[in-house]
Regions:
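Short strand-turn-strand beta-turns centered on an Asx-Gly dipeptide
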Residues: 195-199
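Extracellular glycan-recognition surfaces and repeat-rich motifs
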Residues: 1-26
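Short, aromatic/His-centered strand-loop micro-motif at the edge of beta-sheets
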Residues: 122-134, 157-182
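Beta-strand-rich interaction surfaces with strong enrichment in secreted/lumenal proteins
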Residues: 43-50, 168-174, 203-204
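Secretory/extracellular carbohydrate-interaction modules
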Residues: 24-156
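Structural motif
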Residues: 21, 57, 191-193
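Ligand-recognition surfaces built from glycine- and aromatic
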Residues: 57, 67, 210-253
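Short tryptophan-centered beta-strand motifs in secreted/extracellular beta-sheet-rich domains
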Residues: 179-187, 192-194
């Protein structure tokens, strides 16, 4: 794909090792310093101009350096919901939004990115989020309530409220991610199918709404909003360098 843009933190690297093949790598380092390497096709676009909508099929071949990477990694489609951008330096103008995504997603044990109390939230997952397309400017009304996330009883109430707005679906995948596999995602209105090496692993009616962008990344970040309401986030210690290798990336409508 010729529309992919590279984004990294200092010391991390995205390198094209052959035409259409990429190596995303992070150095070792201590907790408290964010390390991140990413390819995407949306950084320069407003959310309303993101490239992808159903029906489509995404296909990627991938392997990762370890089955226990500290942080997160993955690939798929999302609306970049948490990014704020004023359109400076070639980026698209963007405000926060509720999440819409369909992706293969790995989360180390410090993470808990599920609103449902029974959904899998760690390990290698096939996952979707589907949220109403509320104009982002209206979400600004919730900003004064963000400090309440530090108060467990209030955070639990907020979590239950978000569960009413944000639909989600996820399944744990039993895959040796250190070996090459072909990952496929088929997104239709009202259905998403996840396949590994041509075999269906997960089928869900929870389909994201709106236009989405392609993202492929690895980082040492953790974020958790578990059932106990103790919201937390940060960056993890990385004793060893880690990498994500990708090839044959394609998205077809």
């Amino acid at each position: 794909m010729d529309k992919l843009r590279i984004r990294t933190t200092p010391g991390s690297e995205v390198k094209e090792t052959a035409p259409g093949s990429w190596l995303l790598s992070l150095p070792s380092g201590k907790a408290g310093a964010y390390r991140w390497a990413q390819l995407d096709d949306y950084i320069h676009l407003a959310r309303s101009a993101f490239l992808w909508r159903p029906p489509l099929r995404m296909e990627i071949s991938a392997r990762v350096s370890s089955g226990h990477v500290p942080g997160t990694w993955g690939f798929g489609l999302w609306n970049d919901p948490f990014n704020v951008s004023a359109g400076i330096g070639g980026t698209g103008r963007r405000l926060p939004a509720f999440p819409n995504c369909a992706w293969f997603f790995y989360a180390s044990p410090d993470n808990y990115l599920a609103l449902g109390d029974t959904h899998p939230a760690q390990g290698f997952l096939a996952a979707t989020f589907s949220s109403p397309l509320i104009p982002p400017v209206f979400l600004a009304a919730g900003v004064p309530f963000l400090p309440l996330l530090a108060v467990k009883p209030a955070a639990r109430i907020i979590r239950r409220f978000l569960r009413l707005l944000v639909k989600e679906s996820a399944a744990q995948l039993s895959v040796d991610v250190t070996q090459w596999h072909t990952y496929q995602l088929e997104w239709r209105a009202g259905e998403v199918r996840f396949l590994v090496d041509g075999a269906v692993q997960f089928l869900t009616p929870v389909s994201p709404l709106g236009r989405l962008g392609l993202v492929l990344w690895i980082d040492n970040q953790f974020a958790a909003f578990p059932p106990d309401g103790r919201a937390r986030f940060g960056s993890l210690d990385s004793p060893e360098p880690v990498w994500l290798e990708l090839s044959a990336i394609s998205v077809h409508e």
